[in-house]
UniProtKB/Swiss-Prot annotation:
Catalytic activity: uridine(55) in tRNA = pseudouridine(55) in tRNA
InterPro entries the record matches: PsdUridine_synth_cat_dom_sf (IPR020103), PsdUridine_synth_N (IPR002501), tRNA_psdUridine_synth_TruB (IPR014780), TruB_C (IPR032819)
One function term, GO molecular function aspect: RNA binding
Enzyme Commission numbers on file: 5.4.99.25
Function: Responsible for synthesis of pseudouridine from uracil-55 in the psi GC loop of transfer RNAs.
Species this chain originates from: Heliobacterium mobile
SUPFAM superfamilies per record: Pseudouridine synthase
GO biological process: mRNA pseudouridine synthesis; tRNA modification
Domain of life: Bacteria
Gene of this entry: truB
Keyword terms: Isomerase, tRNA processing
Residue positions of the active site: D45
Protein name: tRNA pseudouridine synthase B
Enzyme class: isomerase
Amino acid sequence: MNPLKSPLEGFLNILKPPGMTSHDVVAKARRILREKRIGHMGTLDPDAAGVLPIALGQATRLIELVRGDKSYRAQLLLGRITDSQDVSGRIVEEHPIPQLTRQAWEELLKEFQGLMEQIPPMVSAVSVGGKRLYEYARQGIEVERPSRKINIDRIDIVQYHEHAPGELILDVDCSGGTYIRTLCHDIGQRLGCGAIMGWLIRRRSGPFRLQNSCTLKELEQGLAPEKLVSPGEVLQHLPNMEINERRLPALKQGLAQFLPDKNWMEGQWIRMNYRGQLLAVGQAIWQDDRWLCQPRKVLQWSESILK
């Protein structure tokens, strides 16, 4: 049961095709669904394909709380450097390709796991000085970009042949905000021969997986309601508290709710459910020698949940 007022309140796991920008996908979904409030989670390059979750209606208020970790499959091509760090860019350097065994590759890739700093590419949506980096790049201007902390949990070789040493297929699990193009570039710099990203598929974004994605064609066929994922399902990683029915009016007014004794952390996000249905999300606060949950995002719900 959908506790929210509109039948299209929640998340859709869209399969973005190559050749469309993330903005194009959102614009097309908006036209198909006739829903003004739509937002996507995590920009995908135009040439990339894969999971692009979008939020509809009230769910757009919850985007910041959705898990941001990602999984990718990518093609790494050695011996070239381009101005965009991928195959679509202008070649600026070419170098001989080194011969490496699979074992040597596995040892090398261990250096690129864990916490590290990454400088985003010039052709990216990162803002510097109030402008997107790709806007500077279009004008032929290169600006200094601050590095960002990222985490690569796993990087595995899916395919490598020693008779074709210039290409690898990699699987990467990483934190949100990681640029796989830049990872490929940095691997090439480490080897001294340069490298770029070929194709890229996002296989997972938070709880959204490639095998459960839906196409824009399916949206055109009217299948959105059955593909919709509820906010409660998407926020399963957050701890939960059940609201007593007599406290529902107070919740609607945004009043704090008493939390059972637990080792809460100040500011910790909590799902606020009634009969298993998400009605709000709040944060733990310590007040008057007890823990309370202060609602921060109260959703508009249908009175049918009381029946």
